[in-house]
Amino acid sequence: MQTIYLKKFGKVLVSRPAGREAFNAIRSTLNASELIQIDFEDVLTVTPSWFDEFLTNLADFSTGTVTLLPTQNASVLAALPVLATARQDKVASIIQQFLSKK
């Protein structure tokens, strides 16, 4: 099991290019077949565009399970339904699984 602590990319996560850059920065440290968890602790804000880019790249890379750890972060809770509605793929499935546990 691997945990990605998003706080290592900053407290304010904005823009599609920054999301892509964040994923590219950690790709070489990840094992694609292992469970990957995403931790939102200490992140103040994440925009749908940043998270869409990051999670899309992660979902495409991973052959295992990707899960989102529970959070009370309002920006995360607002961004996720937007992404889940806009997509019909592995990213939407990851988000729907998280939202069903709320």
Where are these regions (language model features)?
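Residues at alpha-helix caps and immediate loop-helix transition turns in enzyme cores, especially N-
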Residues: 18, 50-51
